[in-house]
Structures are given as structure tokens and as C-alpha cells.
């Protein structure tokens, strides 16, 4: 579809509401105003007007706002009609506007896409709009606002600027090899490169925090039947999310709870007890449990402390450990400490974390919460932080890899040309974050995930 068309969409959520907003962007916005309002509102002033149908009858009445480009969200002429939030009224008004020549419905995210294409936002800021709408906690919302205001982009621009200066220095060393000073071996370039690498690592650390705030951690509770898995889910959720009985195999399907630990989203998944099952329904539940386990960020291996004194996972259940992915982090949770009399606490056993607690009484649950937060490297202090997506982390990782390779070329071979190429590739990776270097396919995927009216 053409980006020069005039587009229209509902900017408020579908359904009934006190206010419903239609947004128009493009060259024909002023023509829409004359047709529907009978006049062009004064720019950036709220005008209370009737919204007219083609025969002159009134469809609705409300506030009209006109923002001439380039001083608008999209950088184009923008008209907003704020009327009553009934779906029938909004649909009639939308049909009225679409009947005008040159108007079409906006694609998902097209308003934000036009803001990006018209240099009103960079790509990271545009993504922050969607992240702000989807924020599931106060910290995530504040970090999304920081990203929208350019906090993340500013850090990326600082890195790109530092790489630009470094590339100039390296290119000069390559272009003037006959100078008395050997710029590649005098330590200045290496010092600057080390500084950029350190700054990049700091941004990566902050980005990982931002990614945790946005996406959270998927934690699967797994173990044998009647180990207390559902009781642990209820204790973490702070409510009776799962049915708890003394009957083994009560949980037969996957149960999901979304909670927060000091602002970090946590996706807790309770699964069916793992055993050889003859019942078809239970067997399907166990297969689903294994699917969730294999996709988890961490597994809480639930153990009934009254049935074994073992603390090493392989000794507790070797068949379970043999089936787990080798890189999957595990925390052994010895449950029913209120019965066994074990001392509550967190210890390390052969590289695995082990927590003793009572899911029934809630003793030790706070220790588990702190452990989950610390195991992901999450810190509650996100003042000035920003949200980050997986593509941002991948771009930062790629840039770091190119800088490491460039450093090796510098110190081992004084290979200026190869260093310059690695610096260029690192700069290109960073520019993908803000959209200064992005494929059309990438832009399409990003903006298609937005709301229609954004």
C-alpha cells in the first residue's frame, strides 16, 4: 500500500466507551475536515462541532483537533475527531470518511510507521509506544516512557558516534602509512576501542534488564504427583489459582499464572505430575508438561521432602534429569519443610540451587521469590532504565562480537583494514536498533504488531 494515501482508523479500543476517537493522517485530512465539519478547525485548538453525514444530517458531535504537518505525530496533516464511544456511531462516522476520495483504512501500526518514516520518531521510540500500551507493571510503563522519550536511542547514538570517531582514526592510520607515528600500535586506538567495548557492555546489561521488564521469565514447576506443585503455584500467585487435594494426579493440564516480583513479570506454569500414566487424559497432560519444561527459562524441580533425603537432582530422579535440556537452569525445591523439620534456606548442591520451604504454610516463599529475581540478574532499581526487545539484544550482541573480533585483529596483527571492517559492521548492527539501517521486511514485522490506530 502507498504511504502517500490518506489513512483513517479508530484510535480508541473497540467496544463501548465514554469517548471514541477517529484519527486521519495525510494530505486529504483538510478535505475530510471540510466535508465532515463544514470547516477547517484552527490548528492545535479544540473545536466543538457537529459531525455531518453526506446529506447534512448530524451523525454525532464532539471535539475536532487539526494538526498541520510537519508539526504532528505522523509529520503529516492530522485530524482527530473525538465523539461518543458507541461502536455504531463510530462505524457510521468511519464509513462517512471512507466514502471520500483517496481515503483508506490504516494498517496496524501505520500511524507510527509514518512518524518513523517522517523522522518524528526513531525505530526504538516507535516500538516503545507499543510497549507502553502493553506494559504489565508500573516499572515497565516508566521504562517504556523513558524509551519513548529517547533514553535508549541516546545510548545507541553515543555508541555509534564513538565508533564513527574511532573509524575516522583507523582510516587515517590506513591512509597515511608513511607517517612517522604508527597509529595502530601506539595504544591510542586500542584504548579508545576498549572504552567503546566497556560502554557497549554497560548498555547490554541495562538492555537485559529492560528485556526482563518487558518479557519476564517463564518458570515451570515440575515433579512427581503430589509433590506440592499446585500449592507452590498458589503460594507464589497469592491466591487459590489451582485445585489442591491429597489425591495424586489432581492437576491434569497446564495452569498459568502471571505475577510480578518487584516489577519483574513472571510467568509461572504448573504442570501435571510426571509419571507413567495409563489414563489418556493424564498422559496428554504429561506430554504438555514436557513441552512447557523444554521451553522454560528455569524449572522448579519440586520434591516431596517426606519421601527422600536426597538433594542432588540426579540422585532424586535420574530419568527426569536425563530428559532435561543440558543448558536448562534448575532449582530443586524440597517441599514440606513444616513436616520434615528441615531448616528453611537456599544452598548450592553440585552447581544446582536448592531451596527448603513449605508451600502449604508459605514459609520460605520469599526466599524463592528473591532467588528467582537474582537468578535472572534482575534489579529492582530501574530509575532511568529503558525497555528492550529481543531484536535489540541480538543487535547489541552482534555489535559486541564484531568489536571483540576487531580488537583481536588490532592486537595480534595490527590489521587496520580488518579492524575498520569490524567497526563498520558493529556500527551497522547498532543502527538497526534505531532504524537508521533497517530492511523493509523488518519494518513490516515491527509495525504490523501495533494497534490499528497507532
Curated annotation (Swiss-Prot):
Signal peptide region: none
Co-factor(s): K(+)
Record's protein name: tRNA modification GTPase MnmE
Superkingdom assignment: Bacteria
The keyword Flavoprotein is assigned to this record: no
Positions with a binding annotation for Mg(2+): 230, 251
Any one cellular-component term (Gene Ontology): cytosol
Cofactor, free-text remark: Binds 1 potassium ion per subunit.
Keywords carried by this UniProt record: Cytoplasm, GTP-binding, Hydrolase, Magnesium, Metal-binding, Nucleotide-binding, Potassium, tRNA processing
Annotated SUPFAM superfamilies: P-loop containing nucleoside triphosphate hydrolases, TrmE connector domain
Chain positions recorded as K(+) binding sites: 226, 245, 247, 250
Amino acid at each position: 500500500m502507498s504511504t502517500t494515501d490518506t489513512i483513517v482508523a479508530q484510535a480508541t479500543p473497540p467496544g463501548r466507551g465514554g469517548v471514541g476517537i477517529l484519527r486521519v493522517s495525510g494530505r486529504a485530512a483538510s478535505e475530510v475536515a471540510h466535508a465532515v465539519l463544514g470547516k477547517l478547525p484552527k490548528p492545535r485548538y479544540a473545536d466543538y462541532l457537529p459531525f455531518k453525514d453526506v446529506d447534512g444530517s448530524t451523525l454525532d458531535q464532539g471535539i475536532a483537533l487539526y494538526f498541520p504537518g510537519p508539526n504532528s505525530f505522523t509529520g503529516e496533516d492530522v485530524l482527530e475527531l473525538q465523539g461518543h464511544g458507541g461502536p455504531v456511531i463510530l462505524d457510521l462516522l468511519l464509513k462517512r470518511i471512507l466514502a471520500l476520495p483517496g481515503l483508506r483504512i490504516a494498517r496496524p501500526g501505520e500511524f507510527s510507521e509514518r512518524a518513523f518514516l517522517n523522522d518524528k520518531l526513531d525505530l526504538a521510540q516507535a516500538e516503545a509506544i507499543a510497549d507502553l500500551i502493553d506494559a504489565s507493571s508500573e516499572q515497565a510503563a516508566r521504562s517504556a516512557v523513558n524509551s519513548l522519550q529517547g533514553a535508549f536511542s541516546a545510548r545507541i547514538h553515543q555508541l555509534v558516534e564513538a565508533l564513527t570517531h574511532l573509524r575516522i582514526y583507523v582510516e587515517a592510520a590506513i591512509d597515511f602509512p608513511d607517517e612517522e607515528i604508527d597509529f595502530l600500535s601506539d595504544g591510542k586506538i586500542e584504548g579508545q576501542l576498549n572504552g567503546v567495548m566497556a560502554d557497549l557492555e554497560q548498555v547490554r546489561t541495562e538492555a537485559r534488564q529492560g528485556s526482563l521488564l518487558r518479557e519476564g521469565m517463564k518458570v515451570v514447576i515440575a515433579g512427581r504427583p503430589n509433590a506440592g506443585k499446585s500449592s507452590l503455584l498458589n503460594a507464589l500467585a497469592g491466591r487459590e489459582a489451582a485445585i489442591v487435594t491429597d489425591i495424586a494426579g489432581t492437576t491434569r493440564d497446564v495452569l498459568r499464572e502471571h505475577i510480578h516480583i518487584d516489577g519483574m513479570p513472571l510467568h509461572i506454569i504448573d504442570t501435571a505430575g510426571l509419571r507413567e500414566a495409563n489414563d489418556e487424559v493424564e498422559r496428554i497432560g504429561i506430554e504438555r508438561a514436557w513441552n512447557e519444561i523444554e521451553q522454560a527459562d528455569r524449572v522448579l524441580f519440586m520434591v516431596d521432602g517426606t519421601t527422600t533425603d536426597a538433594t542432588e537432582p540426579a540422585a532424586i530422579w535420574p530419568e527426569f534429569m536425563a530428559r532435561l535440556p543440558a543448558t536448562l537452569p534448575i532449582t530443586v525445591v524440597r517441599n514440606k519443610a513444616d513436616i520434615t523439620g528441615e531448616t528453611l534456606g537456599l544452598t548450592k548442591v553440585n552447581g544446582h540451587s536448592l531451596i527448603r520451604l513449605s508451600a502449604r504454610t508459605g514459609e520460605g516463599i520469599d526466599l524463592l521469590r528473591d532467588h528467582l529475581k537474582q537468578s535472572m540478574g534482575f534489579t529492582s532499581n530501574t530509575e532511568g532504565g529503558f525497555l528492550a526487545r529481543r531484536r535489540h539484544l541480538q543487535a547489541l550482541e552482534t555489535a559486541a562480537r564484531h568489536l571483540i573480533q576487531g580488537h583481536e585483529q588490532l592486537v595480534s596483527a595490527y590489521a587496520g583494514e580488518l579492524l575498520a571492517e569490524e567497526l563498520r559492521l558493529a556500527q551497522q548492527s547498532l543502527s538497526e536498533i534505531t532504524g537508521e539501517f533497517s530492511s523493509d521486511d523488518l519494518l513490516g514485522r515491527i509495525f504490523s504488531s501495533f494497534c490499528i490506530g497507532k
